[in-house]
Amino acid sequence: MKLLVIVLSSLLLTSCAGGGLSNSSENSYVSGSGAAVYIKQSDRRDAPKFSGETLTTGDLTLNSNQVTVINVWASWCAPCRAEAPLLQEFSIQYPQVQFAGVLTRDNISSAKAFYENFKLTYPTFIDDSILVGFKGSLIPNAIPTTLIIDKQGKVAVRISGEATVATLKKMLEKVTADA
């Protein structure tokens, strides 16, 4: 009986933390808590090279010698919709930083509607197999997830869940100040 209570409590807490499981094709994804993890320079891992087809601009390769914000999103994700205006605003406020999205578990027509609705101007990669290169840096199944890659091409920050103005600003300033 005690075990049953523990299991049910765990399931309840998991489903309440940041949105729980969503429906339809995205049924194995959960929203993160929004917690940001700053990784000290000596512990950072290489990020994969970003190259591939984008939602609107065709093939693209990102500059690996520039601070880069990568946002993993889907049009059906409520926290993704909530943070999209913030990411767009920051992409304009920080012209020295590259911004890019990675679409996951979504269809192109819904993603394009999302992209147009939020007037996003930064590119979004449509092949989420690029995420395999982030093994160990991404929390499996957390959408949205935002990564900040430093100038050396290493993962410096992971935000699992909806990014806030304060968190994104603090983390961007920290990473851009890194030597």
What does each model-identified segment do?
Residues 1-49, 179:
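N-terminal targeting signals for export/organelle localization
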Residues 36, 71, 132-135:
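N-terminal post-signal-peptidase region of extra-cytosolic proteins
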Residues 42-68:
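A short beta-strand-turn-helix
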Residues 58-81, 87:
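Short active-site neighborhood of thiol/selenol oxidoreductases, capturing the structured segment around
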Residues 65-67, 95-98, 122:
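Loop/turn elements at helix/coil->beta-strand transitions in domains of secreted/extracellular proteins
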Residues 81-118, 130-135:
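Structural microenvironment flanking redox-active thiols in thiol-disulfide oxidoreductases
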Residues 116-121, 127-177:
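Thiol/disulfide oxidoreductase modules built on the thioredoxin-like
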